[in-house]
Amino acid sequence: MKVIGLIPFKNEEHFLPTYLSNVKPICDEIIAVDDHSIDNSRKIMEDAGVMVKGYEDTEKLKGGWTCGLIRQHLFNYGREAGGTHFVCLDADETFTSNFVPIARDIMSQLEPGEKVRMQWLALWKSCTHFRNDYTVWSNNFKDFIVRDDTSLDYNYGYMCEGRTIGPNTDETQRTLELEHGAVLHYQFSFYNNFQLKQAWCQIGELVQKGQGAIHEINSKYSITMLEDNVGMTQMPEEWIENIPLPDIPNFDPEWNEKYFMRKNLLPDIYRHFDEYGVEYFKDLNVWHIPQLREKLNA
């Protein structure tokens, strides 16, 4: 058994130590693709012994999203390196600490094409509590680990790709009980950054799909604003012990740009504004972000 972690990243220097903390100990190797980061992401990964590959794609989607295409390359790299099992977490995720000691034993029991399906905990404006209510941000499960079957391919969609190769069915997925381990998703923990990224996604998607997609995009991303009657559950300390975290506030009411973790997002948005005009995007629900609202009202 050779376990390889596969990760695409772009400007994730703040989260990569978090990812590495509980992914590296269960992997024999990690292979990453750096999608043109302009921060210290690549150095952090290389210093940790990760094999980092660059990525060039002449058919890059004009909305600026290449993650699904990169995942295809990652599975090829993993196979070339002799991987039998692939761990597919993103940079703003890591495993709960209680999963680490049992992870390899669980993976060793998988048949070719089988996957470990784990609960995906949305840490909402917090690093110690996960969302637990009746919204789409609760009780989510996802395929994060797969034993390779070389007859399988990877499929993706624009900004909504899956993680592992092959179909997700009752026959291919083994669901891990929450008390044995889960995946911590820190995307929502640092809320200004979450909202900025969602605005970046919406604006990029409108560029990619055109004005006719306004209603579709607003409907799709309305779930990012579900703030009423939020239910939260505190995690046991043993789930999160020894996990390093970004040193920024969970929410900054002043929206100070020094706390923006991905330095490309705001410049990317401004570039679209310059190319298309701010009015092109006026019907999107992104203007709660002060920097964008200022551009609209200028």
Give residue ranges: language-model regions.
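Catalytic-site signature of metal-activated, phosphate-bearing donor transferases
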Residues: G64-Q72, S97-A298
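Short, well-formed alpha-helical segments that are part of the catalytic scaffolds
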Residues: N11-I26
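Short beta-strand-to-loop acidic/aromatic patch adjacent to the donor-nucleotide binding site
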Residues: G82-T94
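Short beta-strand/loop segment that forms part of the nucleotide-sugar
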Residues: D28-H36, A91
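Active-site nucleotide-sugar/metal-binding loop of Leloir-type enzymes
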Residues: G68-H85
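Cell-envelope/extracellular polymer assembly enzymes that use nucleotide-activated donors
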Residues: K2-I4
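A conserved acidic beta->alpha catalytic loop
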Residues: D34-M45, T58-E59
